[in-house]
Amino acid sequence: MKPVIETHALCKSYHGRPVVDHLNLTVPEGCVYGFLGPNGAGKSTTMKMLLGLVHPTGGSVELLGHTLNEANRIALLRQTGSLIESPSGYLHLTARENLSIVADLKDVDRKDISRVLEIVHLTKDADRKVGQYSLGMKQRLGIAMALLGNPKLLILDEPTNGLDPAGIQEMRSLIASMPQTTGATVLISSHLLGEIE
């Protein structure tokens, strides 16, 4: 299988302190790939570099067979869904309204909203205000936003953080099914070994 993500000696320093130091990472197509490390190890920084949100101090990133740069960043991100740190959404709007905004921003047909709601098991709660959602439901909504447009790659930064045991199990099952249900490769970070296994 060809890799969907490759990093070559990827580095990031803040004020001379290395946060990511010569990371060589290869994520094969069609899998769920775990990225494990303790808190403060640079996982979120790495994921932000993969998305072009943080510029590396050194090294390079290849996404979907192309070296990530300013010229192709937007085109590559149209094929990439992400949930970095915590889910965002307008609490005073419904899930469907939030997804409509994201679909418009991504220039994705609103018909895709029903598909992603079904994948994340939020169809029956689609017309509830997001402010009434549990954290697990907000996380699933964040994943639904990432799935709009049927991306080839999903980058999920600690998506089970703060969830109760039932929410963690539900999220694990959802993520494990992604390559089969959506065709997307998934990169997931965690500081818990049991989570990645």
What are the roles of these predicted feature ranges?
Residues L154-E158:
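Catalytic Walker B motif of ABC-type/P-loop ATPase nucleotide-binding domains
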Residues S100, D104, R110-D125:
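Conserved ABC ATPase "signature" region
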Residues Q169-T182:
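Helical segment within the ABC ATPase nucleotide-binding domain
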Residues L51:
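Helix-to-loop junction immediately C-terminal to a conserved catalytic motif
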Residues G59-N69, A75-L76:
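Conserved ABC transporter NBD signature motif
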